[in-house]
């Protein structure tokens, strides 16, 4: 896999961060500008929908509208067009994620790891964002403003995997996963704060979300449009792939991907075998599927685009661009 990844550091107030993102987009992917700013023409219903989405942002994702407005100003388009064209584009992913709690880590700290699988048609952009009044964070971007995952400067880790992937995306009023992930990174310091934020958050998506904090707490939040299950953990490990496993949500899906079950069982088997280290978690990420999490099936939306690791005590984030079983794709520290 030969692709170019981008790392951006964005600092300043939300509007200036939005403008900087627009400049980066215009420079790196000028063909993508039209995705965000396609005009509505005479379709007044889309304008009204954009206005409604901005109002939802104001309530549930405070501060995000200012970023969108700066982005729109720089591109010379309307904020309503930007929010409509990002919120209505379906995105998902075939991912694996695990958090090891201090009693099961040889370091006595909280260790996190995840891989993200999709096709080669992706943003491939890691961002560090520092906006006054919010937690600074580093994570992979989706549609500029959203996040697939990340670690903030308060020691909170967030990662996601799509759940119930064979079900059609619901048409209920709500956000895609990336808005929830970004808002947790911006606003939360602990697992309990993340659960409190996520519980009422309107979601038009089927999601497995794992959060962990530097105090040795973690939780798996399985969330759909009309139900949510939460499993808290302070010992052992917690993990997820692409299906629901908790009471209250696991009956949601009537069909499951075999590769999701295979990866879920593999992680559990290897994690139970012994206490974990950053190196042992890296081995999970860098061993080829099915006896590992590194995948190369890009034409089937199942190729590893990146892997992340973090030790929440020292706040280090390690990213591998591309599948981790390729020797040239080393982990870099951010």
Regions found by a protein language model. Give the residues of each.
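C-terminus-biased signal that marks the final domain/tail of proteins
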Residues: 1-95, 189-200, 206, 214-218, ...
């Amino acid at each position: 896999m030969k692709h170019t990844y981008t790392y951006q550091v964005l600092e300043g107030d939300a509007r200036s961060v939005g403008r900087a993102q627009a400049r980066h987009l215009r420079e790196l992917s000028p063909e993508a500008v039209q995705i965000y700013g396609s005009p509505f023409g005479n379709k007044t219903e889309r304008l009204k929908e954009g206005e409604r989405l901005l109002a939802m942002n104001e309530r549930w994702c405070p501060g995000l509208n200012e970023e969108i407005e700066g982005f729109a100003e720089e591109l010379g388009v309307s904020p309503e067009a930007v929010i409509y064209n990002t919120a209505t584009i379906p995105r998902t992913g075939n991912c694996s994620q695990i958090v090891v709690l201090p009693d099961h880590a040889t370091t006595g700290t909280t260790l996190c790891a995840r891989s993200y699988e999709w096709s080669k048609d992706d943003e491939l952009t890691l961002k560090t964002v520092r906006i006054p009044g919010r937690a600074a964070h580093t994570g992979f971007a989706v549609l500029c403003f959203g996040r697939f995952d990340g670690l903030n400067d308060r020691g909170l880790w967030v990662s996601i995997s799509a759940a119930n992937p064979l079900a059609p995306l619901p048409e209920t009023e709500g956000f895609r996963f990336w808005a929830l992930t970004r808002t947790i990174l911006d606003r939360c310091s602990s697992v309990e704060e993340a659960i409190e934020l996520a519980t009422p958050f309107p979601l038009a998506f089927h999601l497995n979300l794992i959060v962990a904090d530097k105090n040795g707490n973690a939780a798996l939040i399985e969330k759909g449009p009309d139900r949510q299950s939460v499993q808290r953990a302070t010992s052992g490990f917690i993990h997820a792939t692409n299906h629901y496993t908790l009471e209250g949500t696991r009956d949601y899906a009537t069909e499951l991907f075999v590769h999701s079950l295979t990866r879920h069982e593999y992680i559990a088997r290897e994690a139970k075998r012994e206490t974990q280290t950053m190196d042992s978690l890296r081995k999970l990420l860098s061993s080829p599927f099915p006896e590992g999490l590194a995948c190369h099936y890009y034409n089937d939306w199942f190729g590893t685009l990146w892997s992340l690791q973090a030790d929440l005590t020292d706040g280090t984030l390690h990213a591998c661009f591309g599948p981790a079983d390729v020797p040239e794709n080393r982990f870099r520290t951010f």
